[in-house]
Regions:
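Alpha-helical transmembrane segments and their helix-helix packing motifs
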Residues: 1-153
């Protein structure tokens, strides 16, 4: 959250025109507008991919394999629009802070950002965090079942 505040306070979001500020606040608005079920399911799918990336990187022998193992699942989670609570702890405050700064008022005029509030952050983080926990636990259970479960004699 501190990084989001510094980025907003330094007017980084308008360095290259208004499009970046509009994109940041629009992303935050989309995240704050998710239903509980959508946040939960996107959180599960996201952390399945994040944990899979870590698992692959541990299994890879070469540095290139480790990088590819991390990169591809993370790329997929970003491209699919899945939700991760840690990422949202940046994205949503990065949308909240410009809304409170008069320097961004002209750039953000006409943008529907009514959901971008601290309550919106909480309404996103609760289901997404639960989903992340369930997704990580699901992959952990699969790992346990496949590799660590002792066969019945």
């Amino acid at each position: 959250m501190a990084v989001a505040w510094v980025a907003s306070a330094s007017h980084t979001f308008t360095l290259f025109g208004d499009w970046f500020a509009i994109s940041v606040v629009g992303t935050a608005a989309a995240k704050c507008s998710l239903s509980f079920a959508d946040g939960l399911l996107r959180g599960i799918l996201c952390n399945l991919l994040v944990c899979l990336a870590v698992w692959i990187s541990f299994a890879a022998k070469s540095v290139g394999g480790k990088i590819a193992g991390l990169y591809l699942p993370i790329l997929l989670f970003v491209l699919c629009g899945y939700e991760h609570c840690v990422a949202n702890m940046y994205y949503i405050p990065a949308g909240i802070f410009p809304l409170a700064d008069p320097a961004y008022a002209e750039a953000l005029a006409g943008l529907n950002a009514s959901a971008v509030t601290w309550a919106g952050l909480a309404s996103n983080l609760i289901p997404v965090t639960l989903g992340n926990i369930l997704g990580g636990a699901g992959l952990g259970l699969a790992y346990w079942y496949i590799y660590l479960k002792k066969p019945k004699a």
